[in-house]
Amino acid sequence: AEGPAWSSQGRYLLWSDIPNNRQMRWSEDDGHVSVFRMPSNYSNGNSFDFQGRQLSCEHLTRRVTRYENDGTATVLADSYNGKRLNSPNDIVAHPDGSYWFTDPPYGGQLYEGEPDAAGGPSNSAGKLNPRIGQPAGFVPAKRELPTNCYRIDPSGRVDLVVSEDQVPDPNGICFSPDYKKLYVVSTGKGPGDTGAGGKGDVFVFDVGADNKLSNGKRFSDFTIDGVKCGPDGIRCDVNGNVWCSSNAGRAVGYNGVTCWSPEGKLLGRIRLPEVCGNITFGGPKRNRLFMAASQSLYAVYTATQGAGPA
């Protein structure tokens, strides 16, 4: 499970089932689970903007899509400076109407969407056949861009806001409650990837009035008890605390969710019996933390509320 997002208008949770190329929905009213969208173009991260429209990061098509309230779909971004995106991973909305998203290489993995063409960073030996299991007419392509973060302006212009040199392999992304800080997770390489690769850190930037970022620094190296806990999805609560999912692999007891103060102090942990990929706050009062793990969804009521669109 990946990319959980809460619809306050529909009072449901949706998430991505990447390997099965579909999105799922859980209804709060009756607890019913159903297929929400299939195919999903191997979507990963999802969220909702301030108008209640779903935003989705698609691996297969290497694009960011917005689903309008009338049911139509709008492609927000699929390239930068004439080059195709890698595999948009996570996305958040800003009150000014812009969208900010990460573009790491993970969709180039065999199990997550579109493997690189022969010679690409995720298929350097050229032994993987990217066409197997894909739609008719599918044309594989090599990675064309570094792993960056972008901002989609309300006009439709796509701007680079965080480069690979600053945050390699960016993954989770979120704003502080006042939108004056941007948090970006830098994760490690995927299996067989020969790209830059992050080191499992979380970075924070100041956001200026002109949407320019400054004062970028490491927020946390995400090491607890000497164990590198592998951050992935990230969200802030209304108090500015930072909640982050944890993929510690075989380090039993370190998978789940961690909560950090705005100063980077560890406040607490939620331990799960499996790897946690992403999180979101939801429920009618937005005080319930939903956790998308490798094979399950978990939820816990908290004493705070998630920041972001109501």
Regions found by a protein language model. Give the residues of each.
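Beta-propeller domains
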Residues: 8-38, 141
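Short loop/turn segments immediately following beta-strands, especially the blade-tip
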Residues: 204-212, 301-309
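A short loop-to-beta-strand structural motif that recurs across blades of beta-propeller domains
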Residues: 22-24, 63-65, 147-150, 201-203, ...
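Beta-rich, blade/repeat-based domains predominating
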Residues: 1-11, 39-58, 63, 81-101, ...
